[in-house]
């Protein structure tokens, strides 16, 4: 199965999710509308208020964590709270130093520059970013060969917000230049059910509390997945029932979509069962595991594993991956004695 084809894949997916009007409506605009991530929200309120009181641009910010948790949304909220414009791009798009220079020179004082997948910046672009972040200056080379010379352009004070799913992949010099590091965690069921209810309200979709909770339980702690499942369950409710989503309707729809009580799909179960059946519960190395299930090691490491580890189904040890007691219980398999 291709990772991007999964219904519970946390990256943006499909033409429906590219519908900007719906996407904008479902996103919170201000911190008071933002659900979950309580510590992060509390910190941001203080940092934003302090910057506003001093009349300064907010310090540069690095937002990291698994995909689908709201890094882009949070960047937009920061710009809204500061009352400034936001310009968005991504690391792979900025191929040349001139690409970044064009963005920086068009910023107004206090503006936010948001770079998604910042860990994928090229080294050439990254070198340009250092003086821009530290001194609000841009070093430009004029001419070629022996006649080449460097000139400095002053930039207005701005806030760089970088987002990444792989904070460890950032170079140390770049990471050190972010004054505000923020890690986003998987959402609990209570917060996620509130997000589901809010999104259903935006879509004018009737849903009761138990239906929202059932959707939240199977959404892997990820708002993007919760909103995607909500749309699919809506289709089921409109065709098979009277359009209203309750626990029974959500159960039937999600079972039909092959998403179990823990939010696992075929790929998750394949990974866990490979460790249990093919490697006797582990430990198993990442390369062997990738070969056994026919996936790239990066897909396992960055996409499948984080939620399974966080929920206690897999342990990552120096010797390899191990299936936990909880994994055996999930499949009603008796764990062998070792």
Curated annotation (Swiss-Prot):
Ranges annotated as spanning the membrane: none
InterPro entries, alphabetized: AAA+_ATPase, AAA_lid_4, DNA_helicase_Holl-junc_RuvB, P-loop_NTPase, RuvB-like_N, RuvB_C, WH-like_DNA-bd_sf, WH_DNA-bd_sf
SUPFAM superfamilies membership: P-loop containing nucleoside triphosphate hydrolases, Winged helix' DNA-binding domain
Annotated stretches, region: Small ATPAse domain (RuvB-S): 188-258
Residues that bind DNA: 297, 316, 321
Annotated region (Head domain (RuvB-H)), positions in chain: 261-338
Binding of ATP, residues: 27, 68, 71-73, 134-136, 177, 187, 224
Domain notes: Has 3 domains, the large (RuvB-L) and small ATPase (RuvB-S) domains and the C-terminal head (RuvB-H) domain. The head domain binds DNA, while the ATPase domains jointly bind ATP, ADP or are empty depending on the state of the subunit in the translocation cycle. During a single DNA translocation step the structure of each domain remains the same, but their relative positions change.
Subunit structure: Homohexamer. Forms an RuvA(8)-RuvB(12)-Holliday junction (HJ) complex. HJ DNA is sandwiched between 2 RuvA tetramers; dsDNA enters through RuvA and exits via RuvB. An RuvB hexamer assembles on each DNA strand where it exits the tetramer. Each RuvB hexamer is contacted by two RuvA subunits (via domain III) on 2 adjacent RuvB subunits; this complex drives branch migration. In the full resolvosome a probable DNA-RuvA(4)-RuvB(12)-RuvC(2) complex forms which resolves the HJ.
Function: The RuvA-RuvB-RuvC complex processes Holliday junction (HJ) DNA during genetic recombination and DNA repair, while the RuvA-RuvB complex plays an important role in the rescue of blocked DNA replication forks via replication fork reversal (RFR). RuvA specifically binds to HJ cruciform DNA, conferring on it an open structure. The RuvB hexamer acts as an ATP-dependent pump, pulling dsDNA into and through the RuvAB complex. RuvB forms 2 homohexamers on either side of HJ DNA bound by 1 or 2 RuvA tetramers; 4 subunits per hexamer contact DNA at a time.
NCBIfam families reported in the protein's UniProt record: PRK00080.1, ruvB
Identification of the protein by name: Holliday junction branch migration complex subunit RuvB
Gene name tied to this protein: ruvB
């Amino acid at each position: 199965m291709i990772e991007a084809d999964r219904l519970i894949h946390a990256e943006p997916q499909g033409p429906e999710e590219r519908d900007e009007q719906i996407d904008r409506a479902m996103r919170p605009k201000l911190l008071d509308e933002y659900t979950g991530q309580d510590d992060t929200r509390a910190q941001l309120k203080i940092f934003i208020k302090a910057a506003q009181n001093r009349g300064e641009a907010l310090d540069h910010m690095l937002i990291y964590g698994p995909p689908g948790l709201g890094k882009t949304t949070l960047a937009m909220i920061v710009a809204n709270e500061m009352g400034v414009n936001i310009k968005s791009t991504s690391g792979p798009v900025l191929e040349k130093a001139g690409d970044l220079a064009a963005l920086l020179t068009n910023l107004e004082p206090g503006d936010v520059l948001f770079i998604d997948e910042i860990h994928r910046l090229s080294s050439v672009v990254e070198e340009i970013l250092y003086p821009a972040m530290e001194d609000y200056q841009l070093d430009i080379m004029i001419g070629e060969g022996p006649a080449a010379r460097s000139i400095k352009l002053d930039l207005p004070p701005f806030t760089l917000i970088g987002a990444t799913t792989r904070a460890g992949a950032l170079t140390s010099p770049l990471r050190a230049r972010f004054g505000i590091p923020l890690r986003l965690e998987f959402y609990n069921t209570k917060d996620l059910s509130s997000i589901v209810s809010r999104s259903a309200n935006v879509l004018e979709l009737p849903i009761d509390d138990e239906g929202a909770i059932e959707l939240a339980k199977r959404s892997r702690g990820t708002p993007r997945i919760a909103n995607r499942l909500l749309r699919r369950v809506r289709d089921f409710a409109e065709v098979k029932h009277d359009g209203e989503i309750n626990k029974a309707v959500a159960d039937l729809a999600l079972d039909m979509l092959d998403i179990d009580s823990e939010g696992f799909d075929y790929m998750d179960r394949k990974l866990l069962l490979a460790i249990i059946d093919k490697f006797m519960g582990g430990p198993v190395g990442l390369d062997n595991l990738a070969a056994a299930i026919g996936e790239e090691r990066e897909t396992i490491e960055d996409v499948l594993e984080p939620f399974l580890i966080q929920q206690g189904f897999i342990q990552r040890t120096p010797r390899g991956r191990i299936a936990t007691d909880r994994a055996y219980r999930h499949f009603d398999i008796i764990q062998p004695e070792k």
